Amino acid sequence: MHQQPRSPAPAASTSSARRSQDYDRRSDSPAFDLRTHTNRGLGIETENDTAEPEQSSQPGPEAISKVNQIVTNYHTKAALIILHSRVELPPSYAKNSNVPRVNRWFNVELEETDALKDQLKTWRTCDATDNRPPPMIIETYLDTAGLTNNQTLVALDDNGKRWDVTESLAASQSSRPAKASSSRAVDVILERWRVELGDMPGKLPSDLGAILPTVYKKSIILFRSLFTYSKFLPAWKFIKRNGRSRAHPALRVKYRIFSGHARDLSKQDHLTMPLFEGDTKVVDTYSFGVTDSPAGPFSVQVTYRTCCDFRVDDSEALLSSQFMGADDEIFQPSLPSGGLDARVTPEVGSAPLTRRTVEDPDLSRAYGSLSTFHHVGPTTGASPISALRAAREARASSPSPPTSSHRNSFAAARASPVGRAATLANDTNPNVARRPSISFQPFKAPPLSASPSLVDPPLSASPRTTGAGRTSLSDSRHMPPPSVTTSSRKPPSFGPDNANSSPNSASPRPTPMSRYSSAFSHRRGRPSSGGINKLEDDNSSGRASATSSGAQPGSGLLAEITGTSSDSIHADDENISEFLKMLDLRKDLLSPSSQTAMDNHSRRMTAASAALSRFRGMKDSNAALSDSMSSSLLMNRSSATSSKQLSGVPGIAGTSISTASSPGGKAISPHTPHTPAIPSRLSSNSIVDNTTTRLHGDNGSPVEEDASDETTTERLPSTVTAIPIPTSPATIFPSTFRRSSSAANRRSSHAIDDDEIFTMRSVSLGAEEPSHTTLGALQRQQDYEPIGTNIAPLESGARSSGGDDGNVLRGPTRRGPGAHRDASLSGPTVATSPYSHHPLHQRRISHSRGRGFSGGPHSLSSGSSSIARGGLIHPYPAEREAERDANAGASHSGTEDRRGTGRGSGGGRHNLPQAAQVEEDEPLLFAMSDFGASRRSFEEGRQGNHGPDSSGNTGSSRRGSGKRGTLSGFHLWP
């Protein structure tokens, strides 16, 4: 009837609440996994479910072995990479193989070595759990134990100063209370590498096998960075520099590997000791980062010296340099300050006082062309034109007067012409006088690009004053005229402005002014003579003077405070601007507007080219004609006049010379003929005929020769080359008969002239004694001697083309102007000259016959000679002398017969007896062509007129009888 308590119900509820709390607690733990507890939803519990999480937290032995391999190779690979880049390690080979073993861990292939086996034994036997590796320290250092007593290891700082390393380390050790061992005192540590494995955070995870591939990939990046960066450090550069050269053994880098716990690095450290004084850092540190792994974080760090410039020097030399203070600082002379320069007042002729430091260079002291611009100070990249323009604008915009004490160095700079060193202009005093320029001529003959001036002005010249305007004519200096070579090498340039008066010329000489300047404007030629002025001195090329050029540093020449004018620079700058504007305005000049204009231009160019080619072809003939005319004009003068007017030609009368010499003006040698290439009729007195009589009849074979023929004629053996147009000795012809119409009138010959001329003989003519009695003296001597008349008939026939008397009278001559004009022509007699067989005369002709008589036998003949034209050479010397006498005397008559008189012959010289031949060839002492009223032209004379002579033979004239008539028909002048 009353209720009973229910005990089972609360018990069941308590049991379910306990299960729900246990489920919630397991789900919050990281080891709980829903996939392994799917069967718990039914409330079924087993004992195996509670032991499963403890078994899955332990990794397998295979995964632990892989972790240990990574830790071991992590240390050994780092040591191999570091030491391979610092020292030479011997490779290790496999058994029975010559191929070295290669370490391919972390995708960096390096040769294995057994040299590090003992030193790396600690890190080869370590593991990640029980025997963890200590930090590995690798040091590279220099060992000074190998130095001798007179050798010292020195370190060079950034300024190149030498420091004794041993003394520096000893000084650093004495400043600290703790001292290192003596064995470490001689070591200079370059680098210190630290490879370390950090502490492991906890137990190894159960899924260690899945994490290891990711750790390996991260390590590849680390070791590749280590391999690359190890070759960027200063120690590697020092090793490579010594490896290329045979360095001292003390400079070879050594290494050591030790554990990080072996010593306390807080004590004395040689790596951080400074070796020399300075503000730079002694050491620097670089870290390659941290690579996470299940065994702990991997890290690599390097501490290195920033300066690794070492060398071995002699101890005594280093000590003496320290005593002398040569390495303390670079010697710098004391320089005046800017205020001192402003207070200094220049004096006339004083030494240069303005000096500029390198920090404040004078921009006008630049040299070079427009394309190569060199500064005194640091390079600013400014071209010379822009620098000059900036200087001009600065002067124009400067409000301060020119007499201000403080001047801007750039505004006060007066730039000289491009290519020359300039001087600092002085505007404070307009009346400051300039010192005379002192030019240097280092070369005898300057090359094409030589800049020194060819003319040196006198050192005693008065200084020129430079004012605001141009230099007046009265203040200009004068200089002596240069030589002929200088004037020919540097032609004068003319300008529109200032003309300077010269003491050697009456007319003023213009100063050189150019339309516009270029890169070679500093090489403009200077006038050959006359004075110079300031503008000319400024424009002169390469005048190394104290006023117009500023010396470069170290040359010994200092710049001087002068009033150099810059008008020439401004004018050049303005001319360049105007020229560029003109090119912009007249662009049609470069590009023709139409095709017609282009065709016209091409036709004009073609015509001009054709004309130029034609005139070039005429150049040689015109030059030869000019030389022939000059030779004909100059050969009739005396030796004194000829030697003065011809440069390099000795005055030797009777020598066949011409002015057709080389352009260089070298002297004409008497060994080589210098005759005109073109026949000239300017002077008949300088042409003679030494040939035999032309034969045009029945008596024998004629020897016909034209005056215009070439020299390639048949001749007998002779050592002298035939010359087409030779000239004859001046003493053969009398001075009283000269043609008034001749272009070159022969001057009167005197005995003293003849003696001087014929005694001037070439050395090559031999050692025979010359005759002191000349032909002219013998000719005048026979005028005073009794002359015997020896009449002989002339077998050569009549010498007229009009049928007149065919015999020619060679009458006696008497002294006086009218001696030849009064000669009788009516009788068939010939006067024999008493000097024709004179021994002196024979020897003179013999000399000319044998050795070329100052030009050969052709010097006595204009057309042909007795040797070259078939003349018979007598076998006996006496007969040969007689023939030469006859040839020398009859040359003049033969010449005049060719020029205007008809001449015939009944027989040649070969057909005559020797006695008659000698008498026939007696010389005529008068010029037949001088009696003619006029001359026939060259064309009419070449046609020739023929007429019968008195002996019945047909005589021919080379150039016709003309208006002169025959010999018997001459009208004698009173």
From Swiss-Prot:
| Entry annotated with the keyword Cytoplasm | yes
Give the CC-aspect GO terms: Atg1/ULK1 kinase complex; autophagosome; cytosol; phagophore assembly site
Compositionally biased spans, kind Polar residues? 462-474, 681-694, 826-835
Q: From start to end residue, where is composition biased (Low complexity)?
A: 1-18, 403-422, 498-508, 541-551, 856-871, 950-974
* UniProt biased composition (Basic and acidic residues): 19-28
Which keywords are on file for this protein? Autophagy, Cytoplasm, Protein transport, Transport
Determine the domain of life of the protein's source.
Answer: Eukaryota
- Bias kind Basic residues: ranges: 838-850
**Compartment annotation:** Cytoplasm; Preautophagosomal structure
Query: Mind listing the GO biological process terms from this record?
Result: mitophagy; piecemeal microautophagy of the nucleus; protein localization to phagophore assembly site; protein transport
Q: What is its main location?
A: cytoplasm
GO MF terms, alphabetically ordered: protein kinase regulator activity
> Where is region (Disordered) located?
1-63, 389-561, 642-749, 790-871, 883-974
Q: How does it assemble?
A: Interacts with atg1 to form the atg1-atg13 kinase complex.
Free-text function comment from the UniProt entry: Activates the atg1 kinase in a nutritional condition dependent manner through the TOR pathway, leading to autophagy. Also involved in cytoplasm to vacuole transport (Cvt) and more specifically in Cvt vesicle formation. Seems to play a role in the switching machinery regulating the conversion between the Cvt pathway and autophagy. Finally, atg13 is also required for glycogen storage during stationary phase.
Tell me its family: Belongs to the ATG13 family. Fungi subfamily.
What is the protein name stated in its UniProt record? Answer: Autophagy-related protein 13
| Provenance organism | Emericella nidulans (strain FGSC A4 / ATCC 38163 / CBS 112.46 / NRRL 194 / M139)
GN (gene name): atg13
